[in-house]
């Protein structure tokens, strides 16, 4: 009787942003297709892959700690992802790492796995890989990555040095993936990239094909096509180019979610110039006003940095004034943190940590008040909610205004007869600074 060879087992650690998560999903899909088993513990694994983040220093530290833990617990480790672009830094701390690759180096990662843990001779797992591939998100939503890299050279960021310049995926390929996701039961697609509004710039917005039909490689064309799938489509990381105006009518018509994630970073023209970001606050406020006139339901999310080198109290006050005027719905704020390799490190007038902390607190206090007022306006109204979790106490979902993990939630106490992915009409009964409570209509 022939001896059955056990399936080779791979452990996997995925760190960082949703874009990194998509890279992890792709590697895991390839591994499963080839017959590798993916296991949740170091002890059972023949090898561990760590997909790292290297965006800010705290993320670098977390990645180095994760690599160290994998080495201590298992011993055979391959490193990939953004921090992998800095091989010397990893080798200095962890010389025993077997191999290191940069971000989106899927083929190299698989070659290294094959070298240390040879492929199984037969493939009983092929039918277990779903058509849409392995997903690390809940079944009812998925991230759709449309491009790699970035053409901007913001002084606080090192993404281009790690992930390279913009490379747009062919639009036919993107739309085919979206269709597979919908066929697999996904109810919400979150479009992600380093710069979603630049989609197609690198290929001069050339015409691609989907189902035999010509489609322009652009954000607006992509949104028009995704709207035909009959699911929620949410846009993230939208740089404020003029053509962003063209997607607002699609939101007003209900074709894609009335949700725009635009990282504005600051409101002082001087600081924006130091950041190498576009800098007309008045124009931005005018656009926001115009967008809301076209699409009153529009939710605006943004992120800002306080304590950037050279930021004075006057600059910071301009930022607070902008918040008061813009009344954004969802806001993230970060204290400036030096990133190794970023141009901003060389700027004069670094802001003391205690000043950063004090400004961050003032920023958050103001935005918390604005957020509470914006949510209070929804009390008494009916909204659509997609369910994320259900337990014996009730259900937790999100409105069209809430992206997973970064925004608020809608709590439906006592609502147990639903399942994740269901979309309900809900009457809002209560609101606090970030979340809503309501009951099914």
Swiss-Prot record:
Annotated Gene Ontology cellular component terms: cytosol
Keywords attached to this entry: 4Fe-4S, Cytoplasm, Iron, Iron-sulfur, Metal-binding, S-adenosyl-L-methionine, Transferase
Disruption phenotype: Mutant shows a lack of methylthiolation of protein uS12 and a decrease in transcription of a subset of genes.
Cofactor requirement: [4Fe-4S] cluster
Residue positions binding [4Fe-4S] cluster 2: 150, 154, 157
Cofactor: binding details: Binds 2 [4Fe-4S] clusters. One cluster is coordinated with 3 cysteines and an exchangeable S-adenosyl-L-methionine.
Pfam family membership, one: UPF0004
Entry GO MF terms: 4 iron, 4 sulfur cluster binding; aspartic acid methylthiotransferase activity; metal ion binding; protein methylthiotransferase activity
A GO biological-process term: tRNA modification
Top class in the EC scheme: transferase
Domain Radical SAM core per the UniProt entry, residue ranges: 136-373
This enzyme's EC code(s): 2.8.4.4
All residue ranges annotated as the MTTase N-terminal domain in the record: 8-118
Reactions catalysed according to its record: L-aspartate(89)-[ribosomal protein uS12]-hydrogen + (sulfur carrier)-SH + AH2 + 2 S-adenosyl-L-methionine = 3-methylsulfanyl-L-aspartate(89)-[ribosomal protein uS12]-hydrogen + (sulfur carrier)-H + 5'-deoxyadenosine + L-methionine + A + S-adenosyl-L-homocysteine + 2 H(+)
Coarse class of the protein's main subcellular location: cytoplasm
UniProt: [4Fe-4S] cluster 1 binding residues: 17, 53, 82
InterPro entries the record matches: Elp3/MiaA/NifB-like_rSAM (IPR006638), Methylthiotransferase (IPR005839), Methylthiotransferase_CS (IPR020612), Methylthiotransferase_N (IPR013848), Methylthiotransferase_N_sf (IPR038135), NA-bd_OB-fold (IPR012340), Ribosomal_uS12_MeSTrfase_RimO (IPR005840), rSAM (IPR007197)
Compartment(s) of residence: Cytoplasm
UniProt domain TRAM: residue ranges: 376-441
SMART domains given in the database record: Elp3
Family membership noted in the UniProt record: Belongs to the methylthiotransferase family. RimO subfamily.
PANTHER family: RIBOSOMAL PROTEIN S12 METHYLTHIOTRANSFERASE RIMO (PTHR43837), RIBOSOMAL PROTEIN US12 METHYLTHIOTRANSFERASE RIMO (PTHR43837:SF1)
HAMAP family: MTTase_RimO (MF_01865)
Protein name per UniProt: Ribosomal protein uS12 methylthiotransferase RimO
Natural source organism: Escherichia coli (strain K12)
Lineage: Bacteria, Pseudomonadati, Pseudomonadota, Gammaproteobacteria, Enterobacterales
């Amino acid at each position: 009787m022939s001896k059955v060879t056990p399936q080779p087992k791979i452990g996997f650690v995925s760190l960082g942003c949703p874009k990194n998560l998509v890279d992890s999903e792709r590697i895991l899909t390839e591994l499963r297709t080839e017959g590798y088993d993916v296991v949740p513990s170091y002890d059972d694994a023949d090898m561990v892959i760590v997909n790292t983040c290297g965006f800010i220093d705290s993320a670098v530290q977390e990645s180095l700690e994760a690599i160290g833990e994998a080495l201590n617990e298992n011993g055979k480790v391959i490193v990939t992802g953004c921090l992998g672009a800095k091989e010397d830094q990893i080798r200095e701390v962890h010389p025993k790492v077997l191999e290191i690759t940069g971000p989106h180096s899927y083929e190299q990662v698989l070659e290294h796995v094959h070298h240390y843990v040879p492929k199984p001779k037969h493939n009983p797992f092929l039918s277990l890989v779903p058509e849409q591939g392995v997903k690390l998100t809940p079944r009812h939503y998925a991230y759709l990555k449309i491009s790699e890299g970035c053409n901007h050279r913001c002084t606080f960021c090192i993404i281009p040095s790690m992930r390279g310049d913009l490379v747009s995926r062919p639009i036919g390929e993107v739309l085919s993936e979206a269709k597979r996701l919908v066929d697999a039961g996904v109810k919400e697609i979150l479009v992600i990239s380093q710069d979603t509004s630049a989609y197609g710039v690198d290929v001069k917005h050339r015409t691609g094909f989907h189902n035999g039909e010509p489609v322009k490689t652009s954000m607006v064309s992509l949104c028009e096509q995704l709207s035909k799938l009959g699911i929620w489509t949410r846009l993230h990381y939208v740089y404020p180019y003029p053509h962003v105006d063209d997607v607002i009518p699609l939101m007003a018509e209900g074709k894609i979610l009335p949700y725009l994630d635009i990282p504005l970073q600051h409101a002082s023209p001087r600081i924006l110039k130091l950041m190498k970001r576009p800098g007309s606050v008045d124009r931005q406020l005018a656009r926001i006003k115009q967008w809301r006139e076209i699409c009153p339901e529009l939710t605006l999310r943004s992120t800002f940095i306080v304590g950037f080198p050279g930021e004075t109290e006057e600059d910071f006050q301009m930022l607070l004034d902008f918040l008061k005027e813009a009344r954004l719905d969802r806001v993230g704020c970060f204290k400036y943190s030096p990133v190794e390799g970023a141009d901003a490190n060389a700027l004069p007038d670094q802001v003391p940590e205690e000043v950063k902390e004090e400004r961050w607190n003032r920023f958050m206090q103001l935005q918390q008040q604005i957020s509470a007022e914006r949510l209070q306006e929804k009390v008494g109204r009916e909204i659509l909610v997609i369910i994320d979790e259900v337990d014996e106490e009730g259900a937790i979902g999100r409105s069209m205004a809430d992206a997973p993990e970064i925004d608020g939630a809608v709590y439906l106490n006592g609502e147990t007869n639903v399942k994740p992915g269901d979309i309900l009409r809900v009457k809002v009964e209560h609101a606090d600074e970030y979340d809503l409570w309501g009951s099914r209509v």
